[in-house]
Amino acid sequence: MKRLFLLSITFLMSLTLMAKEIKTETVIQAAPEKIWKILTNFGNYPHWNPFITSVTGEVENENKIVVSIKPPDRKCMIFKPIILTKINNKELSWLGKLLFKGLFDGKHKFELIDNGDGTTTFIQNEKFSGIFVWLFNTRNTKKGFNEMNQKLKELAESS
């Protein structure tokens, strides 16, 4: 019985070390300031963003916000992450979790890199961890990231 308990604990601990990551990027023919303005105008998300359909709350470091996402071919999901980093024109990140830390956590990050030639590399990534991460299929979420990136690119380059 003791051996089974120890094996179970070891198994659960190994699952917490598992992680998955999605990373997408695109080069946009616009300055970081222009892209940041679009990216942080959350009230406009329903009009252009096919993946993150809503962000409410004050987006400042350590604040809790409410985010609605709609991965392709999936139902809408709502979660309440904490803002980790907000550096104007450069980076925005948050940490979301399922019920409590360690079950299923996601650290989402948007990064803007000024290429010095009038273009910006936009990187969107998320690192997933926790004991339930092995159940998560990243395919639809990555597709949603790419769709959002493309719409952001189109909007920034057309206005």
Give the residues covered by each predicted segment.
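Hydrophobic-ligand binding "helix-grip"
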Residues: D73-D117, K127-G130
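Hydrophobic ligand-binding cavity/cleft-lining segments
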Residues: L15-E60, E147, K151
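A conserved amphipathic terminal alpha-helix motif
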Residues: F104, K109, T121-S159
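A short, structured loop/turn motif at beta-sheet edges
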Residues: Q29-P32, E60, L84-K90, E111-T121, ...
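N-terminal, post-signal-peptide region of Sec/Tat-exported proteins
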Residues: P46-I82
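Envelope-exposed proteins and targeting segments
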Residues: I22-T24, N63, F79, H108, ...
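Hydrophobic pocket/interface hotspot
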Residues: K34-L39, Y45, I65-V67, I83, ...
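Bacterial Sec-dependent N-terminal signal peptides
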Residues: M1-E21
